[in-house]
Amino acid sequence: MGCSAKARWAAGALGVAGLLCAVLGAVMIVMVPSLIKQQVLKNVRIDPSSLSFNMWKEIPIPFYLSVYFFDVMNPSEILKGEKPQVRERGPYVYREFRHKSNITFNNNDTVSFLEYRTFQFQPSKSHGSESDYIVMPNILVLGAAVMMENKPMTLKLIMTLAFTTLGERAFMNRTVGEIMWGYKDPLVNLINKYFPGMFPFKDKFGLFAELNNSDSGLFTVFTGVQNISRIHLVDKWNGLSKVDFWHSDQCNMINGTSGQMWPPFMTPESSLEFYSPEACRSMKLMYKESGVFEGIPTYRFVAPKTLFANGSIYPPNEGFCPCLESGIQNVSTCRFSAPLFLSHPHFLNADPVLAEAVTGLHPNQEAHSLFLDIHPVTGIPMNCSVKLQLSLYMKSVAGIGQTGKIEPVVLPLLWFAESGAMEGETLHTFYTQLVLMPKVMHYAQYVLLALGCVLLLVPVICQIRSQVGAGQRAARADSHSLACWGKGASDRTLWPTAAWSPPPAAVLRLCRSGSGHCWGLRSTLASFACRVATTLPVLEGLGPSLGGGTGS
């Protein structure tokens, strides 16, 4: 059966709604990606009106500095030339707070700022307290000894006398707090008196004393307002477009960002570059794999094995030399000339002889490799852990008695992990606005398009059913007409061939008495035959009168 008038009206309304849904879905497919991109570009740039500005200014991600010390177990034996033996202690965990100040927007699409850091010890997250004692090399003594190796013997003997007078030894037993944030040492005052400007320390010497309650230098970075492709990239550091610590222009270049955010819309072909003031160099991390952090898609970037390779293994690093074994970087040129080396913890990815020279080292790829998980659409870190180790090169130096018979060795002092992960309300807001809503819009556009297509089929189906129903009724009428006709004409002939001959009596009876059957038939042939059959007798009766009227 066909659709009623009411059904056809409803089908038409659904068709209109379907057309609107299909058009809206198609428009969304074309426009939504562009709109999302525009919103991301608008809100990741460094501008007070952008949504990410406060996140950039006051980083809401809780950062933690976890420090592991290498406690020297056999200092006396080392002085006799035996192999060092160490035991890892820690972690000693500090909550790191960061905030930017002196924010100045410049006319060349850049912004300058100082970022200050403060650290607070976290006993609940630590394995030990800041009052724990650690035996470790005396950097001031052993570092100075290596620095004096090629000096005149007289000067070295004077240095030995000074060490003895001040009570300085090759190894010291200090608390975690003293090693981290500084301890008073008469040798520091002596060095500052006779070698002013050599040390960045005034009264105390500590490995992290420079970092607490201080800034990491004046950064000038691009805002991305005028050119989004340069957003967060460092223009200058402390007014310099390149440093002068190293021996090649490539190694002295300041590349990448300040290490907090990166340009948006990353791909697996992207690399992660940043300038590290602590390492005095730029570093490049490479894409490893895609992942998910708390429902948010991420790209994981890791350090290539060539990061700390020496020049013989990786020629571009030749500018960081003089080098020892591959896998450690000499940072003496930016660390008051002390023979300090930077590497991955436990000499991971370094020449195996380095770890074999010290008992107690166990490099592990999972535990000691650094990584950054970045949201590729915005360039914002979701989860990161930067792990580095600081070591001291020490050896016996003729003329300086405190060095004894120490065999040349790169002895680890400590390694640290600077980690942070987005959490809490910040994570929820980020997920809702940058993951959930785009995902809903992505699926909604296809749902609308599919729904529109389905609704558009309703009036089409209704029209098809109406046409099929009409055809079926016509077919039934034709069949019924032939049946009626056959009852009044046993010879199955519809009409004599002679023009205007009288119709058979059976036809007249059928057509006059069968109004319920024949008059209502829709068959063109049957209807025409019935009408002619009933009309001809009338015309025949009127013929003589019409003819007489004419004759008169």
From Swiss-Prot:
The keyword Aminoacyl-tRNA synthetase does not apply. Residues 1-11, 465-552 are cytoplasmic. Widely expressed. It comes from the Eukaryota. N-glycosylated. The six cysteines of the extracellular domain are all involved in intramolecular disulfide bonds. Glycans are attached at N102, N108, N173, N212, N227, N255, N310, N330, N383. Disulfide bonds join C251-C384. GO terms for cellular component: caveola; cell surface; endocytic vesicle membrane; extracellular exosome; intracellular membrane-bounded organelle; lysosomal membrane; lysosome; plasma membrane. It is a multi-pass membrane protein. The chain crosses the membrane at residues 12-32, 444-464. It is found in: Cell membrane; Membrane, Caveola. Residues 33-443 are extracellular. A lipid is attached at C462 (S-palmitoyl cysteine). InterPro entries: CD36/SCARB1/SNMP1, CD36_fam. One of its GO terms (molecular function) is lipopolysaccharide binding. Its main location: membrane. Keywords: Cell membrane, Disulfide bond, Glycoprotein, Host cell receptor for virus entry, Host-virus interaction, Lipoprotein, Membrane, Palmitate, Phosphoprotein, Receptor, Transmembrane, Transmembrane helix. Changing G2S: Correlated with higher plasma triglyceride concentration in subjects with hypercholesterolemia. One of its GO terms (biological process) is phospholipid transport. The C-terminal region binds to PDZK1. Belongs to the CD36 family. Receptor for different ligands such as phospholipids, cholesterol ester, lipoproteins, phosphatidylserine and apoptotic cells. Receptor for HDL, mediating selective uptake of cholesteryl ether and HDL-dependent cholesterol efflux. Also facilitates the flux of free and esterified cholesterol between the cell surface and apoB-containing lipoproteins and modified lipoproteins, although less efficiently than HDL. May be involved in the phagocytosis of apoptotic cells, via its phosphatidylserine binding activity. This is Scavenger receptor class B member 1. It comes from Homo sapiens (Human). The lineage of its organism: Eukaryota, Metazoa, Chordata, Craniata, Vertebrata. The gene is SCARB1.
